[in-house]
Amino acid sequence: MIAEIISIGTELLHGDIVDTNSAYLAEKLTGCGIDVHYISTVGDNKQRLYKTLQQAVERADLIITTGGLGPTMDDLTREAISEITTCPLVMRPDLVIDIEGYFNHKRTTMTPNNLKQSYLPEGAIPINNPVGTAPGILLEKDNYIIISLPGVPREMKIMFEESVLPYIKKKNNLMIISKELHFIGIGESTLETKLEDIMDSMNPSLALLAGDGEVKLKITGKGRTKKKIENKISEIVKTVRNRVGEYIYGEDETSLPDEIGKLLSKRGVTIALAESCTGGLIGARITDIPGSSAYFKGGVIAYSNEVKINHLGVNKNTINKEGAVSPETAAEMASGVRQRLEADIGLSVTGIAGPEGGTDEKPVGLVYVGLAGIDGEVKTYKLNFKGDRNKNRWLTTQSAFYYLYRYLKFSFK
């Protein structure tokens, strides 16, 4: 079943309101095994709304609209649906009673224009609105189904979940299963190139989502039986792992700190942090994981040179000669925090997050990561970021976690 979602309202086109309804509906429909091929937005203009609906009924089996069901003059959805389906609007006495009852319950006066909401296209089924006055519309035609819901997210969601979702599940008896693979250390474009021949797969379908310094691959299969779907997904996962498995750090509901915590526990080792430009963000992400006290010794936020020297043992001459942002300083920070907190592994970051503080030699976004391993050997990594201050700090944590993850994953026998 192919679906189109239409959001109605001039305020959406002007950017006054963000359209969260479409994202919600797309996620729910996809979860039911329905293919959302189109999402449209149209203003409160009868002619343009009619054309949008006309296009939708020609290319989709299921059309869901949000907005335009209220009592005012710019609420035009009923009229447009009536015209496109050639079903005249008919007053429903039962809806008149419901609308009057709503205002009586609120002890407020009902203006006459509210009765506009009691009109539905002939043959349509009203969708109960338990939190508002505007009922939804469900109209089945020979080749398509139109469902209209209010634009207010609270009303739309409760009506969809209580009335529309059960109806759709009954109509579209497909099971859908998804699996997510999480990647670090490889960009979206490179990953797509390596998987190019399978990215166009229809069932299971593959979708890449990049952001926050990592990439997700969502594999979605649908069918009548769970076993067949899972087998198809497993074949894709096997292919992906054979090609780019070294960059996969986890599956489904997980995070990089979570997987690092599992590896630290599995290896039976502890870690300590020395953070400069991230200001404790790495430690915060580690301690977000329940049970992290088993492997996290603690950290030093060494923002000033004095703290680097006095609390981490960084040589004053190193800072004077090489600078606070240098591979030498990062190495001494990692080694120092490992020794002073008596941890097996020391991880450090020092850099220029911005927006000020950069030079031609050391620009904003320059970061060094230091990693002191269980044998005391220290490695450093140079990074250059181009974001704003917050993005640079976040990407620094991601990169530090990446090097730590690879060390824990591949340096132990």
Curated annotation (Swiss-Prot):
<dbReference type="InterPro" id="IPR008135">
    <property type="entry name" value="Competence-induced_CinA"/>
</dbReference>
<comment type="similarity">
    <text>Belongs to the CinA family.</text>
</comment>
<dbReference type="Pfam" id="PF02464">
    <property type="entry name" value="CinA"/>
</dbReference>
<dbReference type="Pfam" id="PF00994">
    <property type="entry name" value="MoCF_biosynth"/>
</dbReference>
<dbReference type="InterPro" id="IPR001453">
    <property type="entry name" value="MoaB/Mog_dom"/>
</dbReference>
<dbReference type="InterPro" id="IPR050101">
    <property type="entry name" value="CinA"/>
</dbReference>
<dbReference type="InterPro" id="IPR008136">
    <property type="entry name" value="CinA_C"/>
</dbReference>
<protein>
    <recommendedName>
        <fullName>Putative competence-damage inducible protein</fullName>
    </recommendedName>
</protein>
<dbReference type="InterPro" id="IPR036425">
    <property type="entry name" value="MoaB/Mog-like_dom_sf"/>
</dbReference>
<dbReference type="InterPro" id="IPR036653">
    <property type="entry name" value="CinA-like_C"/>
</dbReference>
<dbReference type="Pfam" id="PF18146">
    <property type="entry name" value="CinA_KH"/>
</dbReference>
<dbReference type="InterPro" id="IPR041424">
    <property type="entry name" value="CinA_KH"/>
</dbReference>
